[in-house]
């Protein structure tokens, strides 16, 4: 069944099914579908990211992230572990810490679209711990997160002229690296994953990248905020927020704002 449909208030029919196809892929992906070399690479990225986060755990950036998360958590306690700190919190608050410290040293992966590991790995790990999932389910969520994130991120890359004048959104499309692993672990069906992607489009930040001008450490916290928001969005959809589907197919929504008409919009 096609999800996209005529929006009666403005007579607009979503012209493509990109969001639906990505959502169905994420729902249907199983561990058995993943080639052995991809499983091995996912494990390597997992270990690399945890190692980078542990190396950053005593930095001022980590200290401030823990204080913020602990305050939001109402003190210590919860089902999710903050790596290397002997502390547990609600997964959504632990995600703020782990997303931040995974990027704090810039030692995690480096895709040409950004640093997806700082979202995919903490979010997949914390959701799996929260829901008591297996190692195979963890790896599957990691792969689903990478596959969907990278396709969206590649499709919305702006032209050189646009990003030089309007900014580059590496912490904007990062939201999809955070939503998809949680949605997969939570067992959301394709329709709900579609909703979650739509909420990610609405909650995404502007492609400003001002930190690159000022060299602010806020850049690292942005990865933590995206990880936290990934959990909040998945939980919101799980609770029943609706009518947010097909957002990647509406050119006046996310893709038009991020890359306009001069990027690779939709081609990846």
Each language-model region and where it sits:
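N-terminal core-entry segment
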Residues: 2-267
């Amino acid at each position: 069944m096609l999800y996209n449909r005529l929006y009666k208030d403005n007579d607009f029919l979503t012209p493509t099914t990109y969001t639906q196809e990505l959502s169905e892929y994420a729902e249907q992906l199983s561990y058995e579908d993943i080639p052995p070399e991809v499983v091995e690479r996912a494990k390597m990225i997992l270990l690399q990211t945890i190692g980078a986060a542990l190396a950053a755990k005593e930095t001022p950036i980590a200290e401030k992230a823990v204080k913020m998360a602990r305050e939001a958590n109402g003190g210590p306690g919860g089902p999710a572990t903050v790596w290397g700190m002997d502390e547990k919190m609600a997964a959504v608050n632990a995600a703020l810490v782990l997303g931040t410290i995974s990027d704090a040293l810039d030692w995690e992966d480096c895709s040409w679209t950004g640093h997806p590991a700082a979202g995919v790995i903490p979010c997949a790990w914390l959701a799996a711990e929260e829901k008591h999932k297996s190692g195979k389910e963890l790896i599957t969520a990691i792969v689903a997160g990478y596959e969907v994130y990278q396709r969206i991120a590649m499709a919305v890359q702006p032209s050189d002229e646009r990003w030089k004048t309007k900014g580059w959104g590496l912490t904007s499309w990062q939201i999809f690296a955070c939503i998809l692993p949680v949605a997969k672990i939570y067992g959301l069906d394709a329709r709900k994953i579609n909703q979650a992607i739509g909420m990610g489009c609405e909650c995404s930040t502007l492609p400003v990248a001002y930190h690159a001008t000022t060299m602010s450490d806020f850049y690292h916290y942005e990865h933590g905020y995206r990880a936290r928001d990934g959990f909040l969005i998945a939980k919101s959809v799980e609770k029943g927020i609706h009518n947010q589907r097909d957002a990647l197919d509406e050119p006046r929504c996310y893709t038009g704002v991020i890359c306009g008409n001069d990027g690779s919009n939709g081609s990846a």
